[in-house]
């Protein structure tokens, strides 16, 4: 698209009371600015131009692997002054101006704005707000059609303060017009700043129609200035996501107690209990249940699978008809196939487990390949690390490992083997045999138990 996108992101964010720049505060797991940039990329612009100031080096370092054209605003003298700093970077036909503290701006709204601006020359996003205090007002002509100017709150007269249509600050302007009008800005106002909104009056003087595109939801255009506003907007966002899932047939026990910090996709008859957190891309197939206080990151959950309470699942694939937890930890690069039982206080890392196998209690399984119909007893540990390198354990089909067993990798437990309780296995165990490594038991006669002195 013949479009440059300017993102205003220079402010300190004093009201956040934080050491971070405002645009680097996290909204649902990502910095504000990253979310705005993600939306900007969906529009396929020629350039994305963030205008930064406070802790500019910190921001540039964070985004160093992304194709962005940063511009520095050394003094914060208003929105108009900020865009002036980008004049030499703007080379496309249209310029879209966004704000780095509006994390939920969506590309569908922006496409409407861009399309309208192509036809008229300038467009801006507005919103009808019940309580418009603190926002610039959209002033229209006597027929309530044509936008003639925007008046900032501190410059409003008594009648203008009654207007409920507000300016969101988001606008799209044909670049030739923008450069001409920026050159005409002055700071003759209560704040002694260069207001970008003053270009609306210049547009009218040049008989360029100003079109207003109304946002459908307040969350999509809401800026964040304080930690309280951040928390409230996050909660509104979570509730919207929960309502969408409920409307798709997902049973969420309490929509006020769910955190969706990424993308959650659910099929039919999924139930999600209270206190669950979902991060990254998570999918849950039909008839599965997620118990209370599960944390699930970037994972796929199969059909008819039950996640009991208090599990932590990260970057894992869990198949159909599985039963997990409570208190299980499934770490990255783990694949559980179908009909698998993982019980309480079991940790699994970088392992694959085949159908109908179970690890019911208190075990660590790392860098391990487990076959079908394997039963691993309580207290089993795969010792995969020698202090320098990781090694693999292979447990073939139909193996039974009794309790309190250590498997010293690299090692193979072959098909049908049984490992006796309390063993430390350092060599491969043969097929269909009982393998033991216990110290011989001793019984001492005439033993006198020590007494306290």
Model-derived segments and spans:
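N-terminal nucleotide-binding beta1-loop-alpha1 segment
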Residues: 1-18
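Conserved N-terminal catalytic core of the sugar/cofactor nucleotidyltransferase
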Residues: 4, 30-112
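Structural beta-sheet core signal
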Residues: 5-7, 50, 96-97, 122-125, ...
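Short glycine-enriched, charge-decorated loop/helix-capping segments at active-site entrances
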Residues: 20-26, 72, 185-188
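Conserved core of the sugar-phosphate nucleotidyltransferase
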Residues: 105-190, 197, 207-208
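Conserved alpha/beta core of the MobA/IspD/sugar-nucleotide pyrophosphorylase nucleotidyltransferase superfamily
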Residues: 164-267
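Acidic, glycine-rich loop-and-beta core segments that form the ion-binding/anion-interacting portion
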Residues: 264-334
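Glycine-rich hexapeptide-repeat left-handed beta-helix
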Residues: 308-453
